Amino acid sequence: MASNEMEKSSKEKEPKTPPPSSTAPPSSQEPSSAVSAGMATPDWSGFQAYSPMPPPHGYVASSPQPHPYMWGVQHMMPPYGTPPHPYVAMYPPGGMYAHPSMPPGSYPYSPYAMPSPNGMTEVSGNTTGGTDGDAKQSEVKEKLPIKRSRGSLGSLNMITGKNNEPGKNSGASANGAYSKSGESASDGSSEGSDGNSQNDSGSGLDGKDAEAASENGGSANGPQNGSAGTPILPVSQTVPIMPMTAAGVPGPPTNLNIGMDYWGAPTSAGIPGMHGKVSTPVPGVVAPGSRDGGHSQPWLQDDRELKRQRRKQSNRESARRSRLRKQAECDELAQRAEVLNEENTNLRAEINKLKSQCEELTTENTSLKDQLSLFPPLEGISMDNDHQEPDTNQTGAAERKVDSYKDST
C-alpha cells in the first residue's frame, strides 16, 4: 500500500520539478528519478532527524542549540498497543529520501530543515538553474543523496533486516516489533538505490562491501555519504526506545546490540536465590562490575552455608532437649523403682516374720497334742469332739479315779 501511494504521488509531482539540463550525462538522470521517488512522502520534512550536510563540511563548530535527535511528534515510549518506531527513521534521511529545499536567504549549513514557501518539499539541487555552472552544481547536489544511499544502504539493510532483495519485505526492527515505516521506506527506495549502485561503476562498492563497511562503523564511506559517521552513534545511544518487557524484569535500552545487552545484564545476579538456585552465566559475556562474572556465587554459597549451619544448630538443640527429657524420665523411673524395691523388701520381711510365728504355733500345737496322747482316753471325754464342753460331774469322777490310781501305786 505504501509503495503504491508513493508511486502515485511521484507521478503527480514529476511535472513540478524542472527537467535536467541537456548537457548532463545519462548517469545524472538516474539520480533525479530516484530523488523524485524519494520525494513521494509529502510530510517528510516533519520526520527529519538531521539536516543535510554538504561534502566540504570539515570541522564545523557545534551550534549553541543541539541537533533535533527526535521528531516533534515522536514519543519516548510508544502508546499502548502500537508498535515502536524503527531505527530507520532515526538515521539521516539522505540515503532514502531527498532533503527539502531551503529558502534562498537561509544559511546553507544550517542544522535545521526549512520547508519551501509553497509547502512542497523540493530537492535543493533542483532550485538552482539557468547557467551551465549552476547546472553542474545541481548535478553534484543531485548525485549527493544517491551516493549517500549507496553508502548507507548496507547499514539500513542491516537494521531493517533486508538482504539486498527488493522482493522481501522484512520490516522487523531491532527490538522485534513489526515496523510499517521501515517497510515502506526500504521497499520504496531500495530498488532505485540498488539499480544505481549496480550501474554506477565509479563508486566501487557493492552491497556486501557496504554492509561490511557499515558493520565496521561506517568510517570508510564517510566522504561518500556526505556526512560524518559520528551522528549515527548518538541516535542509537541518546534516544533509547524501551521494549515492553515482562513485569518485574528490568530491560536494557534497545540498540543494535540488543541481544548481548539483554542477556548480559546482571538481572539474575542482583536477585537473591529463593530456593538456592545459582544463575547460569552466559559464556563469553562478563557482567559489569566484575572481572570473572562469578562474584554472586560466593554470596549464594555463604547464604546456603549459613542456612546449613542454622539447620545443624537447630538439630543439635532439639537432640539435646530430647536427651534431657529422656534422662529426666529415666531418673524418675529409677527413683520410683527404688521406692518400690524398698516396699517389696519390707513386705518380704514382714511375710518372713509371720511365717516364723506360724511355725512356732504349729510346733507348740503338736507338742500339746503329743502330751494329750500319752494320757488314757477318758470315759466322759471324747477326743473327737473338741468343741463339746465336758460335763462337770464326769470330770469330777475322773479326777477321783486318777487320784485313787496314784495312791495305789
Curated annotation (Swiss-Prot):
Domain bZIP span(s) in chain numbering: 305-368
Segments of this protein annotated with the region Disordered: 1-63, 118-236, 274-327, 362-409
Segments for region (Basic motif): 307-326
Presence of keyword Iron-sulfur: no
Main location class: nucleus
UniProt key word Cytoplasm: no
Compositional bias ranges of the Low complexity kind: 24-34, 179-203
GO molecular function: DNA-binding transcription factor activity; identical protein binding; sequence-specific DNA binding; transcription cis-regulatory region binding
Taxonomic lineage from the root: Eukaryota, Viridiplantae, Streptophyta, Embryophyta, Tracheophyta
Keywords for this protein: Activator, Disulfide bond, DNA-binding, Nucleus, Repressor, Transcription, Transcription regulation
Domain of life according to the entry: Eukaryota
Record remark on domains: The N-terminal region is necessary for its transcriptional activity.
Family according to the record: Belongs to the bZIP family.
Compartments where located: Nucleus
A biological process from GO: positive regulation of DNA-templated transcription
Name the record gives this protein: bZIP transcription factor 16
PANTHER family xrefs: BZIP TRANSCRIPTION FACTOR 16, G-BOX-BINDING FACTOR 3-RELATED
Subunit structure: Monomer, homodimer and heterodimers with BZIP68 and GBF1/BZIP41. Heterodimers with GBF2/BZIP54 and GBF3/BZIP55. Binds DNA as monomer and forms homo- and heterodimers. The monomeric form is redox regulated. Interacts with GIP1.
Compositionally skewed regions (Polar residues) per UniProt: 152-178, 216-228
Impact upon substituting residue 358 to L: Slightly enhances DNA binding activity
Functional summary from the UniProt entry: Transcriptional activator that binds to the G-box motif (5'-CACGTG-3') and other cis-acting elements with 5'-ACGT-3' core, such as Hex, C-box and as-1 motifs. Possesses high binding affinity to G-box, much lower affinity to Hex and C-box, and little affinity to as-1 element. G-box and G-box-like motifs are cis-acting elements defined in promoters of certain plant genes which are regulated by such diverse stimuli as light-induction or hormone control. Binds to the G-box motif 5'-CACGTG-3' of LHCB2.4 (At3g27690) promoter.
